[in-house]
Amino acid sequence: MEMQGDSGGAEARWERLAPGVVRRRLPGWDATVGAIAGEGGVLVVDTGSSLHEGVEIRREVQELFGPPVTHIALTHPHFDHVLGTAAFAGVQVYGAVGAADLLRRDRDELRHDAVRHGVAPDVAAEAVELLVLPHHPVSGELTVDLGGEVRVLLANVGPGHTAHDLAVLVAVPGGPEVVFCGDVVEESGEPQAGPDALPHAWPAALDRLLALGGDDAVYVPGHGAVVDAEFVRRQRDALAERFGVS
């Protein structure tokens, strides 16, 4: 499904990657959100850092494609990628296995992390209180059929940036394969290894990502500009050197 002709200002904020596949770089932390549209549904990749951002993403994606969002894939359980999820009523939410348990157990830490990074305390508290957890845990690979020959592969490529890293891959007729990487790949800054990262496993996660996407895919980092396979390989090697693994 292609973007609609009259989509107001939304079209200017979303980058077209392939027919029916777009992404937007959100203000603040330069986090990526994506959308993939088929004839029978629309899948959104990540939901931003607040309910306000989630509402804006939902509205703009519907302006771009017409049908409402039906599926969400959360690439990892960090505040800037999940706190808008409650703005999408009635959708099917996917995450790497264990992500839902972590988000359920560590709500206070999620809220504190958001506030530490500059989210207003009341905004963070509201989003965490209403947070929608993934209904569908992905332990290996799972295909979501959006109709009209659009099939989205959800792949648990972690651990790496976190213990629960999910990649989203789609190949549509007339376009390149597109890989939404989450924060296992970052372009606008050094990859961030927080206290929940598994540094020694991270290079292997990128090996899995490259094996799935291949040399000709378009790779969409969790933060920053779109990159190619060679960039991902260089980042993989830099992480291996940084963390002392082969």
Regions found by a protein language model. Give the residues of each.
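Short catalytic-loop micro-motif centered on adjacent basic/acidic residues
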Residues: 23, 43-46, 70-73, 153-154
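Short, acidic/turn-prone active-site loops that include or flank metal/cofactor-
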Residues: 49-50, 97-101, 185, 244
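Active-site metal-binding motif and surrounding structural segment of the metallo-beta-lactamase
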Residues: 52-95, 211-218
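Binuclear metal-ion centers of metallo-dependent hydrolases, dominated by the metallo-beta-lactamase
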Residues: 228-246
